[in-house]
Amino acid sequence: YGAQPRLLGPKLNPNDLDEEGRLKAEATLIEAVDDAEYFGARGIAFLAGKWSEETKDEAYAQLLKTTVNVCRYAAMKNMNVELEIFDYDVDKAALIGPAPLAAKFAADVRSYCPNFGLLVDLSHFPICHESSADVIRTCRPYITHLHFGNAVADPEAKGYGDLHQRFGYPGSANDVQDL
C-alpha cells in the first residue's frame, strides 16, 4: 500500500522537528496500515520528509521515532513497513536520500523492528547522483522492494525529474539495458 500520497498531499513530514507535526504524520501512517490491512495488502511504503543540513541529525532522530512506532503497530497486524528512497536535493528533497544514509537508517530501524525494509526505485538513482550498482550494493541487506522506473537527470532537458518516463525516453537516465 503506497502511503506516500497521504504524506505529500497535506505536506506531512514524518521527520518534522515540530513534535505535533511529526505526530500528525505518524497518525496518518498508522491509518495507512489500517487501510492496507482492509485492502489485503501486506504492508505500507512511505517516504521521509524534507530536511535541512543544519537540523539533519534531529530530523533523522524524528524519522527513526516515527518509523519504529509505525513498524511496531504494523507488526501487531503481521505487516511490513518500507521506506522509499527518494532524491534528497532535487524534487522531493527527502532526508532518505543517499544510499549510505538509507542503509544506516535501515540498520537502525531493524535493530528494533525486523518488519522494516527499503523500497528502492531505479528512477531515483540518477537524481540521487548514484549508480544502480552502488545503491543495490550498499542497501542490499535491507531491500524488500525494487521498482523499475526512469527519470531525466539533466535539469536543462525536457521532462526533467522523476516522472517515470518510458525506458529509452530522450535524455533519460535509464534504458532497457539498465534493467
Language-model features and meaning:
Residues 1, 9-14, 164:
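Generic secondary-structure boundary/loop-capping signal
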Residues 11-117, 127:
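Active-site acidic/histidine proton-transfer and metal-coordination neighborhood
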Residues 1-7, 20, 29, 143, ...:
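Domain-start "cap" segments at the beginnings of catalytic or binding domains
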